[in-house]
């Protein structure tokens, strides 16, 4: 009950103090106006304040004592996730280098996949290979290994065949390679038989076409006006050359 007695004194002091403070400050400061105090006529009418005893919150609950610490072991709820066995389809090249010097009686059954840069490396013969090249069990024969695939071997064979096919190509002479290089000029698209036939008919009627007629012929034959113009120029040059050869023969 000491708590209730202290609270009772606190409430009584809070009611009495404002009156005494007003009388104390009113003499010093004239600007402060007196507030009407709302006090009861007789303070003896106030009875002692009593508060009910605080009931325990978990007094009647069914909750048992909760331990504040847990066991250091793994709780029973935790179930570790089983990782599947790693079976990679690729063999790293840096693992193969160490495996090449060891004799193997049987092909390896388990491949390991380790992280490595994707940069291409070069074999001793100058061919490039990737570290992610798929190797078949047949590659490991007689304790050795080979990283050259069938695609790379066919590619090198085609390159060697192209060099041999060129009559004057010299792999060590860059000038010879430049002279025998293929032309980079865009190939002209040939006209279809129907287009050539219609252009020949038009050329028989008139060797020179007007601009409007060229646009009309180009629209009918699904060509551009420039293509029709160039074809007629070439056809006139061919006709002049043919006539010149006939006059020489006569």
Curated annotation (Swiss-Prot):
GO molecular function: DNA-binding transcription factor activity; DNA-binding transcription factor activity, RNA polymerase II-specific; RNA polymerase II cis-regulatory region sequence-specific DNA binding
Annotated stretches, region: Disordered: 105-177
DNA-binding region as annotated in the record: 184-243
Cross-referenced Pfam families: Homeodomain, Hox9_act
Name of the protein this chain belongs to: Homeobox protein Hox-A9a
Superkingdom of origin organism: Eukaryota
InterPro entries assigned: Abd-B_homeobox_TF (IPR050803), HD (IPR001356), HD_metazoa (IPR020479), Homeobox_CS (IPR017970), Homeodomain-like_sf (IPR009057), Hox9_activation_N (IPR006711), HXA9/HXB9/HXC9 (IPR017112)
PANTHER family attached to this UniProt entry: AGAP004664-PA, HOMEOBOX PROTEIN HOX-A9
Lineage: Eukaryota, Metazoa, Chordata, Craniata, Vertebrata
Compartments where found: Nucleus
Keywords, in A-Z order: Developmental protein, DNA-binding, Homeobox, Nucleus, Transcription, Transcription regulation
Role summary: Sequence-specific transcription factor which is part of a developmental regulatory system that provides cells with specific positional identities on the anterior-posterior axis.
Stretches with biased composition (Basic and acidic residues): 149-169
Record-level GO BP terms: anterior/posterior pattern specification; DNA-templated transcription; embryonic skeletal system morphogenesis; proximal/distal pattern formation; regulation of transcription by RNA polymerase II
Family indicated by similarity: Belongs to the Abd-B homeobox family.
GO cellular component: nucleus
């Amino acid at each position: 009950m000491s708590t209730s007695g202290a609270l009772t004194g606190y409430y009584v002091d809070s009611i009495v103090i404002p009156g005494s403070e007003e009388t104390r400050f009113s003499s010093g400061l004239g600007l402060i106006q007196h507030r009407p105090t709302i006090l009861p006529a007789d303070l003896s009418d106030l009875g002692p304040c009593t508060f009910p005893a605080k009931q325990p919150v978990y007094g009647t609950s069914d909750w048992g004592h909760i331990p504040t610490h847990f066991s250091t072991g793994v709780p029973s709820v935790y179930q570790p996730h089983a990782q599947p066995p790693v079976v990679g389809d690729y063999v790293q090249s840096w693992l193969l280098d160490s495996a090449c010097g060891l004799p193997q009686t049987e092909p390896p059954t388990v491949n390991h996949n380790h992280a490595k840069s994707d940069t291409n490396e070069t074999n001793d013969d100058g061919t490039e290979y990737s570290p992610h090249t798929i190797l078949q069990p047949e590659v490991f024969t007689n304790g050795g290994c080979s990283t050259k695939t069938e695609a790379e071997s066919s590619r090198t064979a085609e390159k060697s065949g192209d060099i041999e096919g060129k009559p004057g190509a010299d792999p060590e002479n860059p000038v010879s390679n430049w002279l025998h290089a293929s032309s980079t000029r865009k190939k002209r698209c040939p006209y279809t038989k129907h287009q050539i036939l219609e252009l020949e008919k038009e050329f028989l009627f008139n060797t020179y076409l007007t601009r409007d007629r060229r646009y009309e012929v180009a629209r009918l034959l699904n060509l551009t006006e420039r293509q029709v113009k160039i074809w007629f120029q070439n056809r006139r040059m061919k006709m002049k050359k043919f006539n010149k050869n006939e006059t020489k023969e006569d």
